[in-house]
Regions:
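Short N-terminal targeting/anchoring amphipathic segment
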Residues: 83, 88, 203-223
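Short beta-strand->alpha-helix junction loop in the catalytic core
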Residues: 242-244, 280-281, 298-311
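Conserved donor-binding/catalytic core segment of Leloir-type glycosyltransferases
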Residues: 307, 313-332, 341
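Short donor-sugar binding/catalytic loops of nucleotide-sugar-dependent glycosyltransferases
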Residues: 325-329, 359, 384
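Membrane-proximal helix-turn-helix segments that form the acceptor-binding/catalytic region
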Residues: 203-209, 243, 252-274
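Nucleotide-activated donor-binding/catalytic signature segment of Leloir-type glycosyltransferases, i.e.
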Residues: 364-384
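Glycosyltransferase donor-sugar binding loop
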Residues: 352-365
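A short, active-site helix/loop in glycosyltransferases that binds the activated sugar's phosphate group
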Residues: 261, 266-297
């Protein structure tokens, strides 16, 4: 039995979906259940292995849609600037280093290579851009070998992506993706797939699913239909990670589902089980399905997170101390919390608020702190291990 967990992307400031998967991975390992975590998005800025390792996943438990049809392993990047220099067929006449970018110039050919490092000060190269006569013509992406190449041509004085080529370990071509704006055609030696939807459907069909396997759909945007159609004979589960409906739009006869779950709920008869994080949400969903749909789905409650043991403070707790730990995203409303603490400070001078996490709202929070001169009692802590 294998449990396949279907997701889209992952980042350095991951959402609760990825943390839920990380908790799930730990539980599966502790109980001896084989599990794979599948990511469907294209990753251009980082190596997927770096992102998943950061969350505690093992490389062997990760499947990337785009590398599945190659023989490449999920692995950290080891390609170096020296490796790149050996492969450049021209005389390198000048070198420039600016932060995470190393540029190698070949003056005679009017070409330069821009190597983007994994980290500033390291020699590890994530990708290389080749610029000829001022025009971007190619990007190469690396892990322990070249994973894939993007090809560009100038259109209206802009670099236009028209093809990606994916490689095997020996450098042979596994398949091509022909790109036309937001549309893609995937060309294999023995078949042509006319869309990413067909690509995902083909991927699902190649997993060799049996009636002993389980597919858990964590995110379905752009993938739901292909997954639903190609899961059987395995069982299909859907995780509800957020509020599943719009309370303001509910009437006696209609309900507005969260758009991220609308497809799954509309096809609930094809889902073997739904998972909610709380018994309250499960109860609400059952009532709503009974009232607004012809379906009576099987819904189970499994809390998202867990701790391996209960930790207690070694000394006395810090009085009047508040913390929050999350992505600093708009929907988390951490700015509301910061403003509330500023207000509370007026009647509770000892209050202290530590904000853990990073994200798009960080600058906004800094502004709130500075405008209210709250630096002494509201602190941005960034990413930290809060286990202990």
């Amino acid at each position: 039995m294998t449990v396949y967990n279907i997701n889209l992307g992952i980042g350095w400031a991951s959402s609760g979906v990825e943390y839920a998967q990380a908790y799930r991975s730990t539980i599966f390992k502790n109980t001896g259940i084989k599990a794979k975590f599948v990511f469907m998005d294209m990753f251009l800025q980082d190596n997927l292995s770096d992102l998943t390792r950061n969350m505690g996943f093992a490389d062997e438990d990760i499947i990337w849609l785009y590398s599945y049809f190659t023989d490449l392993k999920i692995a950290p990047t080891t390609y170096t600037v020296k490796d790149l220099e050996k492969e450049i067929p021209y005389d390198i006449t000048r070198r420039e280093i600016n932060g995470k970018v190393v540029k190698l110039f070949c003056a005679k050919e009017d070409i330069f290579y821009a190597a983007y490092l994994r980290k500033e000060g390291e020699d590890i190269v994530h990708r290389v851009e080749k610029v000829s006569r001022g025009c971007l013509i190619r990007k190469d992406f690396y892990s322990y070998t070249k994973m894939f190449t993007e090809y560009y041509t100038p259109v209206d004085n802009k670099a236009h992506l028209y093809q990606r080529r994916f490689f095997n370990e020996d450098g042979s071509v596994a398949y091509d993706e022909i790109v036309d704006g937001k549309d893609s055609v995937f060309r294999f030696p023995d078949k042509i797939l006319s869309s990413k939807h067909e690509f995902i459907a083909y991927f699902m069909s190649q997993l060799g699913l049996t009636d002993q396997d389980i597919v858990i759909l964590d995110r379905a945007t752009g993938t739901g239909q292909a997954v639903f159609r190609n899961t059987k004979p395995a069982k299909l589960g859907v995780v509800v990670h957020a509020e599943h409906f719009s309370e303001n739009a509910v009437t006696d006869k209609t309900i507005l589902w969260n758009n991220f779950y609308e497809y799954q709920f509309s096809n609930a008869d094809k889902v073997d089980f739904f998972i909610t994080a709380t018994e309250r949400q499960r109860s609400i969903m059952l009532d709503q399905f009974n009232k607004y749909t012809p379906f009576t789905p099987h819904i189970v409650t499994i809390p998202v997170g867990s701790v391996d043991k209960l930790r207690k403070p070694e000394g006395e707790r810090k009085p009047f101390s508040i913390i929050t730990a999350s992505r600093l995203a708009n929907e988390k409303h951490v700015d509301w919390l910061a403003k509330a603490v500023v207000k509370a400070k007026e009647s509770l001078p000892q209050v202290n608020f530590d904000i853990y996490g990073t994200g798009a709202e960080e600058a906004k929070l800094k502004t709130i702190i500075e405008e209210n001169q709250a630096q002494d009692y509201i602190h941005l802590k960034g990413h930290q291990d809060l286990t202990e």
